[in-house]
């Protein structure tokens, strides 16, 4: 620590600082450092004013030579810092801290030297060096957060002149002891906020600085120096300060009012310590001011009696003076409350309409929905019109040509021409329609009725999409949840079609870094799939929320549970089952399906006469056709039924009757597992009606698409309104399905004709509908 400084020397230093400008432009400005020059050029001629004093560069009791370098420009790289700091000594490493996502610099770095002496020299010579036009701030790196956050030796200085920067503040307070860090608070533009912090190594140095610099003049401004109070301690006293305020804020003051009149207005309520009217750079009043009383009672009485009182023809506002951050917080809360109130006000009455034709404007949109109830507003969203476009210039020339011809016309003709010009001018101000808009009703019931009747209605050959308007964040969350659920269902259906065990249809398991999922070996002799429960990867450790390793279900050739080997991710033993998204696994499934398609179902399939498992392997216990097989794996859920044929799936998804197949389970008469029983097993596997409809829709759509490819989606949606039992019958009876599709087409054609209004023309043909599809898709993308 530095030796104590005599009070006379401190007073002399303060006097010098008070009579000297600390801004840039004099010998106090930090020199711009060229990283190609010698280290000696970093030092200035006057060590007392241009750089840190010897006390601040004294050997620091650090076990490592790690320096913190702050206030860096975002474009500063490790190479730039190495070029600068390597001139002091051997640099072990340099790291610029960056954002983990954007990789943008956070404005600070760490420089590690091989020796502590090099770190001390760099702290003394390179502190406040200009790097990319900004003075860097260097201090010892403190790895212990408890020591970094302690308030011991931390001094707060306020009412600083804007010309005082980090270096000038460091030079002022370095005479009292070793400074660990020194910083002047700045705004986003780099301008001083008028306060700063100095962190000393010891409390004694901080006490000396407070004693000798508090209430002294620095650049002709009296500064306040005191111990720094942590924010959490200030917040705890904030409510008490609010209840016992003495400073009041007054606005709506007449611009002709003087300071004396303003003070006399409040003097009769108690002893006024200070009063001030805010003025601009020209000395004119800004219409507000502040008054501070000695006691809270006087301030409260003034607020109570003067708030709303007339003064020089204007009603005053008198209230407790608030900090800027407090006022901003209140404004933020009031804005949020108003936004929520507005959202609740229009909840259930504001409709969102998309897939609008380009020629539909606000008036036509209002007319379309006016039959359902009173409308408060209707708006079609449009692109912004750019001024000076080529079209406007062309129209301007046409306007001039028309004007010459109108000079010889009669007064009525001129009036009509002026009206036409006004209409054209108004049309030019409207940009191109974005294809969507909003309609707000006054009654939620009217809005609900409009959604029910206008959604999917054909308007000018395009089906409208009408729904309740939602906030952007709510809509985004719903879309993400819907996409996730849809992907999950597709994974389950793909796994079922590929003949995967039930475990592969579950939600993927997240594995923490450093943890590897493991795979169990097959449970039966020659078994191509793991038996019940073995397909799910197991996680080592058994922490909460993770799946434990599944026990083996036994079977011929299977090993006891304690002898099961554990295989790391990506390495599978012969016959083990990889994850469904593995490219090798998908290729194997495709190969098996091709082989099955070539061989066909029936003879040679699992369970058939002479039937064998995949790759010529014998059928294990628990597989279709094997001993004890009832069509279900040990987990109780049915396997996919399209596994006929030798070694793989067969056409039609039917099994040939096998010697080892008992008559139990979902086997149909004659021992064949047909598509109906498979569909029934899928429907009974879930109790969710929405998922059942989804399964039926997935089975209906390809059949309907073969009959009506253009309207397959709409017809499928119409048929899904039927009961599930009727839908299953349609899937089994091809003739009934064709009849029902024809009936749905007739109903749809009749509906389209009934909705056609005058002037809208006939329903679009198939070619027109196909040509209209790209426009609809673009409109949906824009929406």
UniProtKB/Swiss-Prot annotation:
Is Cell membrane one of the keywords UniProt gives this record?
no
Which residue intervals define the domain RRM in the entry? 65-143, 153-230, 246-323, 349-471
The answer to whether the entry has keyword Repeat is yes
This entry carries the following GO cellular component terms, namely: cytoplasm; nucleus
User: What's one GO MF term for it?
Assistant: RNA binding
| Cell compartment(s), UniProt | Cytoplasm; Nucleus
**GO terms (BP aspect):** mRNA processing; mRNA transport; regulation of translation
Protein's job: Binds the poly(A) tail of mRNA. Appears to be an important mediator of the multiple roles of the poly(A) tail in mRNA biogenesis, stability and translation. In the nucleus, involved in both mRNA cleavage and polyadenylation. Is also required for efficient mRNA export to the cytoplasm. Acts in concert with a poly(A)-specific nuclease (PAN) to affect poly(A) tail shortening, which may occur concomitantly with either nucleocytoplasmic mRNA transport or translational initiation.
Please give the family membership noted in the entry: Belongs to the polyadenylate-binding protein type-1 family.
Instruction: Kindly provide the name given to this protein in its UniProt entry.
Output: Polyadenylate-binding protein, cytoplasmic and nuclear
């Amino acid at each position: 620590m530095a030796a104590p400084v005599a009070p006379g020397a401190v007073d002399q230093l303060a006097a010098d600082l008070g009579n000297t400008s600390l801004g840039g432009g004099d010998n106090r400005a930090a020199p711009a450092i060229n990283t190609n020059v010698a280290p000696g050029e970093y030092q200035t001629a006057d060590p007392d004013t241009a750089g840190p004093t010897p006390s601040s560069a004294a050997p620091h009791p650090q076990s490592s030579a790690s320096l913190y370098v702050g206030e860096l420009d975002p474009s500063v790289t490790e190479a730039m810092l190495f070029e600068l700091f390597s001139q002091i000594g051997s640099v072990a490493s340099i790291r610029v801290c960056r954002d983990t996502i954007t990789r943008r610099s956070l404005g600070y770095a760490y420089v590690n030297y091989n020796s502590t002496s090099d770190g001390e020299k760099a702290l003394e010579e390179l502190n406040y060096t200009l790097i990319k036009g900004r003075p860097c701030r260097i201090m010892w790196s403190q790895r212990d957060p408890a020591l970094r956050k302690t308030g011991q030796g931390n001094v707060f200085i306020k009412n600083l002149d804007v010309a005082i920067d980090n270096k000038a503040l460091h030079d002022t307070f370095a005479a009292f002891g070793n400074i660990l860090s020194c910083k002047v608070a700045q705004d986003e533009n780099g301008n001083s906020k008028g306060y700063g912090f100095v962190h000393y190594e010891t409390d004694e140095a901080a006490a000396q600085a407070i004693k000798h610099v508090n209430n002294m003049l620095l650049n002709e401004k009296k500064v306040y120096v005191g111990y720094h109070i942590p924010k959490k301690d200030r917040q705890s006293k904030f409510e008490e300060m609010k209840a016992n305020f003495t400073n009041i804020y007054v606005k709506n003051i007449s611009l002709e009012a003087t300071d004396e009149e303003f003070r006399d207005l409040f003097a009769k309520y108690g002893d006024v310590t200070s009063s001030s009217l805010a003025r601009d750079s020209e000395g004119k009043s800004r219409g507000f001011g502040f008054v501070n009383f000695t006691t809270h009672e006087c301030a409260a009485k003034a607020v109570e009696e003067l708030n709303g009182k007339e003064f020089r023809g204007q009603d005053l506002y008198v209230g407790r003076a608030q900090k800027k951050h407090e006022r901003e917080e209140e404004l933020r809360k009031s804005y949020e409350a108003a936004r929520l109130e507005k959202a609740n006000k229009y909840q259930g009455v504001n409709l969102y309409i998309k897939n609008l034709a380009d020629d539909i404007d606000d008036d036509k949109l209002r007319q379309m929905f006016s039959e359902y109830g009173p409308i408060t507003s209707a708006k079609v969203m449009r692109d912004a019109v750019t001024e000076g476009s080529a079209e406007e210039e062309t129209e301007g020339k046409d306007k001039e040509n028309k004007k010459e011809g109108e000079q010889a016309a009669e007064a009525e003709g001129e009036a009509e021409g002026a009206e036409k010009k006004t209409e054209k001018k108004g049309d030019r101000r409207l940009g191109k329609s974005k294809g969507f808009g909003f309609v707000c009703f006054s009654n939620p019931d009217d809005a609900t009725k409009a959604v029910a009747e206008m959604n999917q209605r054909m308007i000018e050959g395009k089906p409208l999409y009408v729904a309740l308007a939602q906030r952007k964040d709510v809509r985004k969350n719903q879309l993400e949840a819907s996409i996730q659920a849809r992907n999950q269902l597709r994974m389950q259906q793909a796994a079922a079609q590929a003949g995967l065990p039930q475990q592969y249809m579950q939600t993927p398991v997240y594995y923490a870094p450093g943890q590897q999922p493991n795979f169990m070996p097959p449970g039966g002799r020659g078994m191509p799939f793991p038996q019940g429960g073995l397909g799910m990867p197991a996680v080592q450790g058994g922490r909460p929320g993770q799946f434990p390793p599944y026990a083996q279900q036994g079977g011929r050739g299977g090993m006891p549970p304690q002898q099961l080997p554990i295989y790391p991710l990506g390495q599978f033993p012969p016959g083990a089952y990889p994850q469904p998204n593995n490219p090798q696994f998908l290729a194997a499934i495709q190969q098996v399906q091709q082989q099955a398609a070539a061989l066909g179902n029936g003879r040679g399939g699992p369970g058939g006469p002479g039937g064998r498992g995949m790759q010529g392997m014998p059928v294990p216990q628990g597989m279709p056709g094997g001993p004890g097989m009832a069509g279900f794996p040990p987990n109780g859920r049915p396997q996919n039924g399209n596994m006929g044929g030798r070694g793989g799936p067969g056409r039609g998804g039917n099994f040939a009757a096998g010697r080892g197949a008992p008559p139990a389970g979902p086997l149909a008469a004659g021992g064949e597992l047909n598509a109906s029983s498979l569909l029934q097993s899928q429907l009974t596997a879930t109790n969710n009606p929405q998922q059942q409809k989804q399964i039926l829709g997935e089975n209906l759509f390809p059949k309907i698409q073969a009959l009506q490819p253009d309207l397959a989606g709409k017809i499928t949606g119409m048929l899904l309104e039927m009961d599930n039992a009727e839908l299953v019958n349609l899937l089994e009876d091809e003739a009934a399905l064709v009849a029902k599709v024809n009936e749905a087409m007739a109903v749809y054609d009749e509906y389209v004709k009934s909705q056609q209004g005058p002037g809208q023309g006939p329903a679009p043909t198939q070619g027109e509908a196909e040509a209209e599809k790209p426009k609809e898709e673009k409109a949906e993308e824009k929406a």
